[in-house]
C-alpha cells in the first residue's frame, strides 16, 4: 500500500510518502533526503524497495523547504523540528508498528541522528553521512553519530565529505568507488542496510 500525505509542522507542511507491505510490519523505517535533493534519490528508492521486500514499512519525508520549492536548506534546528513533528505523527497513525528506525542520506542522516533519542527510535541508518565539509576538514560532525543507539553508516570511499569511524554502537560500511551520491550500486547498498536490519530482528 502506498500513500502520500502532507503533514503540518511548525515550519510549514512536509510530505510523507508511505509504503507498507501486504502484511502488518514490525518496523517503520523513516528516511530523510539530502540538503538539495529529494526522496527519489537512487539510494533512498532502492532502500525503500528492499525494505518493503523484507516486510518493513517505509516512510520517505520531504522537508517543508523542499515542499515549498526551495533548494537552499533550512537551519538545522528547523529541520529537526519539522522532522520530529512528522515522525511523531507517523508513529501516531501507525501506532500498531512497534519498532521505529530513523535514517536518511547526507543532511537527512544528520537530522535522524540528532533526533533519534527524542523520538525513541530503536536504531539509525545513515547513508552518505557528511563527516566534515570538504573545505573545512576541522569541522567534524562525528559527535552527531554518537546516538547511543545501534547505528549503520554507509559511505563511499571516494566521498569528499569523508568517512566516519566505527564505534561500539556504530557500524561503518565503506563502498569502494562510491562518491557522496552513492549512485554506482544503490541496490547493493540497500541490501547492506536490509541485512543489518535483519540482524537486529527488525524485518518480517
Task: Give each language-model segment a name.
Residues 178-190:
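Catalytic histidine-centered segment of alpha/beta-hydrolase-like enzymes
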Residues 111-115, 135:
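Hydrolases whose catalytic domains are alpha/beta-hydrolase-1, hotdog thioesterase
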Residues 156, 160-165:
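Conserved alpha/beta-hydrolase "acid-adjacent" motif
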Residues 120-133:
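A conserved short beta-strand
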Residues 104-112:
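Gly/Ala-rich beta-loop-alpha elbow adjacent to hydrolase catalytic centers
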Residues 147-148, 153-155:
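Short beta-strand/loop motif that positions the catalytic acidic residue
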Residues 99-104, 127:
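Short beta-strand immediately N-terminal to the catalytic nucleophile in serine-hydrolase-like folds
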Residues 5-98:
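Serine-hydrolase catalytic machinery in alpha/beta-hydrolase-like enzymes
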Amino acid at each position: 500500500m502506498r500513500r502520500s500525505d502532507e503533514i503540518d509542522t511548525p515550519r510549514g507542511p512536509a510530505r510523507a510518502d508511505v509504503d507498507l507491505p501486504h502484511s502488518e510490519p514490525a518496523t517503520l523505517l523513516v528516511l530523510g533526503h539530502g540538503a538539495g535533493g529529494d526522496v527519489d534519490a537512487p539510494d533512498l528508492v532502492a532502500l525503500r524497495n528492499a525494505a518493503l521486500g523484507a516486510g518493513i514499512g517505509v516512510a520517505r519525508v520531504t522537508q517543508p523547504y523542499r515542499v515549498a520549492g526551495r533548494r537552499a536548506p533550512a537551519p538545522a534546528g528547523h529541520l529537526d523540528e519539522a522532522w520530529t513533528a512528522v515522525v511523531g505523527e507517523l508513529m501516531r497513525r501507525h501506532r500498531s508498528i512497534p519498532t521505529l528506525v530513523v535514517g536518511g542520506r547526507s543532511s537527512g542522516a544528520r537530522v535522524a541522528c540528532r533526533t533519534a533519542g527524542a523520538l525513541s527510535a530503536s536504531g539509525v541508518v545513515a547513508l552518505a553521512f557528511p563527516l566534515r565539509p570538504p573545505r573545512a576538514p576541522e569541522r567534524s560532525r562525528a559527535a552527531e553519530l554518537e546516538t547511543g543507539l545501534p547505528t549503520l553508516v554507509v559511505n563511499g570511499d571516494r566521498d569528499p565529505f569523508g568517512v566516519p569511524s566505527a564505534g561500539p554502537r556504530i557500524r561503518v560500511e565503506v563502498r569502494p568507488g562510491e562518491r557522496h551520491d552513492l549512485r554506482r550500486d544503490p541496490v547493493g547498498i540497500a541490501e547492506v542496510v536490509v541485512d543489518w536490519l535483519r540482524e537486529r530482528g527488525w524485518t518480517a
